């Protein structure tokens, strides 16, 4: 019965608001007004007049023009107060009939929470000292036909926050600040790389081969060409082609799509930055990564110390670096530096409670040890390098031990934030790696890499030694804004379809 009464109450509110809209029209006013030129945002009013006393403002009248959404409203008779909200925040307005006129005051009296209004008036301080605007002219700009969410606490239903982000932004200041920070973080990354001489480029999102990562793609069909295409799962292979072509320092910030599960860390479409630098290696990229992230934190937050949940994270340059085999040995006592067979590695996995598949080779098993035993312990920024060649089909082998590659992953607060390596530029080795991946796919690994003959042909023209990097932008923003879920940093995350 409660749900029925709530629906009836909502329907009553919708009806009342539409009746008010009709009244506005009948009085010759437009309930969905036109252009309105402001002189100030609410924050600009507060900053500009912060130092002026009540007496100073009364002596020297300061006119401003502001506009925003009514968030609170009180008063009776011939005067009333309201708080309106704009991009900068909220500010109080004071509306009197003898200042704005009877017709405009009636519009103010009939206005509902959520309506959008414009004010021309003078800045003053109330008896309690609150900086406010006394209206000399009141303009009705937009009638809200639906009531806002709960008045003081914003949206209480987390899923509704994600589905109707506009309501979340309307009522949740923290959410709005998160997305403003997101924009600033991406801009800071761009500025850093542009100043370092990197060229921003754009490459296709529709690929003929799903390559560049171990992931399941979204598949679509091009009608005119009658061919299957894949939404890109990585940006990598096209950027490497540009390195072959002579663009020596390139990056792209763009959407990537993976047809996989949804969690607090994963969304089917997400934003990545990938960059490549000719004549560099993974050590150079490691230094670039920590300098870039430390710079972005300082630029956007004003500090390199950030709070994430219960953890205080130090992003200042000087991050820990550890080989994957050493990390496994330190945590479990298992020494994968020693040569061993697949069967011996599987026996060690069973002994230590590490789940592996029959198709896993020694390199896969080393990685499973790391993911199941060590990853959850890495809170402070840590570069884990030296990944096995079996799980790194696009990375260059380490010249001192070809079982491993010159690759690293960055872990902060128990999750991967970046993946990088000295790029494999030997086309013969690359073909062999792709062939090994095809064998894995035939054995049941549906995330194994496809053969990409066009990319191999590009390598045959000669790619200089190159370092490459991929950073998950959304996870970085989660870290820098202390957001527990990836959905908190995506304006419109992917949600299960519901029938209304």
Swiss-Prot record:
Pfam families: tRNA-synt_2 (PF00152), tRNA_anti-codon (PF01336). GO terms for molecular function: ATP binding; catalytic activity, acting on a protein; lysine-tRNA ligase activity; magnesium ion binding; transferase activity; tRNA binding. Mg(2+) 1 binds at residues 409, 416. The keyword Coiled coil does not apply. Keywords: Aminoacyl-tRNA synthetase, ATP-binding, Cytoplasm, Ligase, Magnesium, Metal-binding, Nucleotide-binding, Protein biosynthesis. One of its GO terms (biological process) is lysyl-tRNA aminoacylation. The keyword Cell membrane does not apply. Its cofactor is Mg(2+). Its EC number is 6.1.1.6. It is found in: Cytoplasm. Mg(2+) 2 binds at residue 416. Homodimer. PANTHER family: LYSINE--TRNA LIGASE, CHLOROPLASTIC_MITOCHONDRIAL (PTHR42918:SF15), LYSYL-TRNA SYNTHETASE (PTHR42918). Belongs to the class-II aminoacyl-tRNA synthetase family. This is Lysine--tRNA ligase. It comes from Lysinibacillus sphaericus (strain C3-41). The lineage of its organism: Bacteria, Bacillati, Bacillota, Bacilli, Bacillales.
């Amino acid at each position: 019965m409660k749900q029925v009464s709530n629906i009836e109450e909502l329907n009553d509110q919708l009806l009342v608001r539409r009746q008010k809209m009709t009244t506005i029209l009948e009085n010759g006013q437009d309930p969905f007004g036109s252009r309105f030129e402001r002189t100030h945002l609410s924050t600009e009013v507060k900053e500009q007049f912060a130092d002026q006393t009540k007496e100073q403002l009364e002596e020297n009248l300061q006119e401003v023009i502001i506009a925003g959404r009514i968030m609170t409203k009180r008063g009776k008779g011939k005067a009333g107060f309201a708080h309106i909200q704009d991009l900068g925040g909220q500010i109080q307005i004071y509306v009197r009939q003898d200042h704005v006129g009877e017709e405009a005051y009636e519009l103010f009296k009939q206005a509902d929470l959520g309506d959008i209004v414009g004010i021309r008036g003078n800045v003053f301080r109330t008896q309690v000292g609150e900086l406010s605007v006394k209206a000399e002219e009141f303009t009705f700009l937009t009638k809200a036909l639906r009531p806002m969410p709960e008045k003081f606490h914003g949206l209480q239903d987390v899923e509704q926050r994600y589905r109707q982000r506009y309501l979340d932004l309307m009522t949740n200041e923290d959410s709005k600040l998160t997305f403003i920070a997101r924009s600033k973080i991406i801009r800071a990354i761009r500025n850093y790389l542009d100043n370092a001489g990197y060229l921003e480029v754009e490459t296709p999102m529709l690929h003929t081969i799903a390559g560049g990562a171990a992931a399941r793609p979204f598949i679509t069909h091009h009608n005119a060409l009658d061919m299957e295409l894949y939404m890109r799962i990585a940006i990598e292979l096209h950027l490497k082609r540009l390195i072959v072509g002579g663009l020596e320092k390139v990056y792209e910030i763009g959407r990537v799509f993976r047809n996989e599960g949804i969690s607090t860390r994963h969304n089917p479409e997400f934003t990545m930055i990938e960059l490549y630098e000719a004549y560099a290696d993974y050590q150079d990229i490691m230094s670039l990564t920590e300098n870039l992230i430390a710079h972005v934190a300082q630029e956007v937050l004003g500090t390199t110390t950030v709070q994430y949940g219960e953890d205080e994270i130090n992003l200042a340059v000087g991050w820990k670096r550890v080989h994957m085999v050493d990390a496994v040995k330190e945590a479990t006592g298992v020494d994968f530096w020693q040569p061993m067979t697949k069967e011996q590695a599987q026996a060690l996995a069973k002994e230590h409670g590490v789940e592996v598949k029959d198709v896993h080779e020694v390199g896969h098993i080393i990685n499973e040890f790391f993911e199941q035993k060590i990853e959850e312990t890495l809170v402070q920024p840590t570069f884990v390098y030296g990944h096995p060649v079996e799980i790194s089909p696009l990375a260059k082998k380490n010249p001192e031990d070809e079982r491993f590659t010159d690759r690293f992953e960055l872990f902060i607060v128990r999750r991967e934030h970046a993946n990088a390596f000295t790029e494999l530029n030997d086309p013969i080795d690359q073909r062999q790696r792709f062939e090994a991946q095809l064998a894995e796919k035939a054995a049941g690994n549906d995330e194994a890499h496809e053969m990409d003959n066009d990319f191999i042909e590009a390598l045959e023209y000669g790619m200089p030694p190159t370092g490459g990097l991929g950073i998950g932008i959304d996870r970085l923003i989660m870290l820098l804004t202390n957001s527990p879920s990836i959905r908190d940093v995506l304006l419109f995350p992917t949600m299960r379809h519901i029938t209304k």
